[in-house]
């Protein structure tokens, strides 16, 4: 089956065509991603209205290009998958409405996909991974440890109780005057730094639960930067390196406890696996930390290619293909975008719920 995927949840506009064969193997036939980095860099972060307008301007052409690269037309597509949440509501509306229009015009089924499910299932596209497995989702908006039991079957074992890890990177970069996006800037600066100069806190280390916390670390970084007076390039490098060291040590404890729990709960799984997903998964220091941790616990470590860690439509198309193959019902044209949409939406919220519902 061939699935057209559409992704517009934040500041990347993307379209992709993915093939899923009868044996369940996946192949990306055509994939296009347009970053809005230039549009938002002057503001030091994503501006929702600018993002939505950019999606409107770019999406149609990107869909045409993805189809062209795949060598197919809309008649050859078996279904349409569009991100329906979580994310910025303006962008979600653009992508989902476009998906609905294509589905209506072609008579093909529509799958309104949870963006987080796209991340959760990417390892099955790239590595043919079998269920169950453990996923660490680390992005600008989410830090979660998730048990992936099957298509549509997810259980959050841990989540951030305050800032997501990607937020911590971005805010650290902003405090130090580094450019947007903050994650890559912090990683580059850290390469020349002394990771032992600052002893930053490791939030929740030793706690029996599997949740994460990064607001205290962010505060410690701010206090360290303010104590230095005029900050030199070496100071910035040392702060970034020490920050990454604290993150690595925190993840070793939090994720390590998750690996032990997986071993206990799924003793019959011969080759357990940890998958890392999300934009922060591109950080090489964190990848090395997780690889070492998996080696110690006898887990297979799977990190998708960098282009599939950040937002992309291939993972959305693949999630649609997985749902279609699993016999899950398609969505109607009344499917609504959701700014908040936890993967385990039927479960009790692990953290607070505001007026907009449970946090993802």
UniProtKB/Swiss-Prot annotation:
Required for the formation of a threonylcarbamoyl group on adenosine at position 37 (t(6)A37) in tRNAs that read codons beginning with adenine. Is involved in the transfer of the threonylcarbamoyl moiety of threonylcarbamoyl-AMP (TC-AMP) to the N6 group of A37, together with TsaE and TsaB. TsaD likely plays a direct catalytic role in this reaction. It is an enzyme of class 2 (transferase). Keywords: Acyltransferase, Cytoplasm, Iron, Metal-binding, Transferase, tRNA processing. Substrate binds at residues 137-141, 170, 183, 283. GO terms for biological process: tRNA threonylcarbamoyladenosine modification. Its cofactor is Fe(2+). Gene3D superfamilies: 3.30.420.40. Its main location: cytoplasm. HAMAP family: TsaD. Belongs to the KAE1 / TsaD family. This is tRNA N6-adenosine threonylcarbamoyltransferase. The lineage of its organism: Bacteria, Pseudomonadati, Pseudomonadota, Alphaproteobacteria, Hyphomicrobiales. GO terms for molecular function: iron ion binding; N(6)-L-threonylcarbamoyladenine synthase activity. It comes from the Bacteria. Binds 1 Fe(2+) ion per subunit. It catalyses: L-threonylcarbamoyladenylate + adenosine(37) in tRNA = N(6)-L-threonylcarbamoyladenosine(37) in tRNA + AMP + H(+). Its EC number is 2.3.1.234. It is found in: Cytoplasm. CDD domains: ASKHA_NBD_TsaD_bac (cd24133). Transmembrane segments: none annotated.
């Amino acid at each position: 089956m061939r699935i057209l995927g559409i992704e517009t949840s934040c500041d990347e506009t993307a379209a992709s065509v993915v093939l899923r064969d009868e044996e369940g193997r996946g192949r990306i036939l055509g994939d296009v991603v347009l970053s809005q980095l230039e549009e938002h860099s002057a503001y030091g972060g994503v501006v929702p209205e600018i993002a939505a307008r950019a999606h409107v301007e770019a999406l149609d052409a990107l869909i045409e290009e993805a189809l062209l690269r795949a060598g197919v037309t809309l008649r050859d597509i078996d279904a349409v998958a569009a991100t329906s949440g979580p994310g910025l509501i303006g962008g979600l509306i653009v992508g989902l409405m476009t998906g609905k229009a294509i589905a209506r015009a072609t008579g093909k089924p529509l799958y309104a996909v949870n963006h987080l499910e796209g991340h959760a299932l990417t390892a099955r596209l790239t590595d043919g991974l079998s269920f169950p497995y453990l996923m660490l989702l680390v992005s600008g908006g989410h830090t979660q440890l998730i048990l992936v039991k099957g298509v549509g079957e997810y259980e959050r074992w841990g989540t951030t109780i305050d800032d997501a890890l990607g937020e911590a990177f971005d805010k650290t970069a902003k405090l130090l005057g580094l450019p947007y996006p903050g994650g890559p800037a912090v990683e580059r600066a850290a390469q020349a730094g002394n990771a032992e100069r600052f002893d930053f806190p490791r939030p929740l280390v030793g706690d029996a639960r599997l949740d994460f916390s990064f607001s205290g670390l962010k505060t410690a970084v701010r206090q360290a930067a303010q104590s230095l007076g005029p900050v030199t390039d070496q100071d910035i490098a040392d702060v970034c390196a020490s920050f990454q060291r604290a993150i690595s040590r925190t993840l070793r404890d939090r994720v390590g406890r998750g690996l032990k729990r997986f071993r206990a709960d799924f003793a019959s799984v011969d080759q357990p696996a940890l998958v890392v997903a999300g934009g922060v998964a591109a950080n090489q220091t964190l990848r090395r930390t997780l690889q070492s941790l998996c080696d110690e616990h006898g887990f297979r470590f799977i990190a998708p290619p960098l282009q599939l860690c950040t937002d992309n439509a291939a993972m959305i198309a693949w999630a649609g293909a997985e749902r279609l193959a699993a016999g899950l019902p398609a969505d109607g044209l009344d499917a609504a975008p959701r700014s908040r949409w936890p993967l385990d939406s039927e479960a009790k919220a692990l953290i607070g719920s505001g007026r907009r519902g449970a946090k993802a």
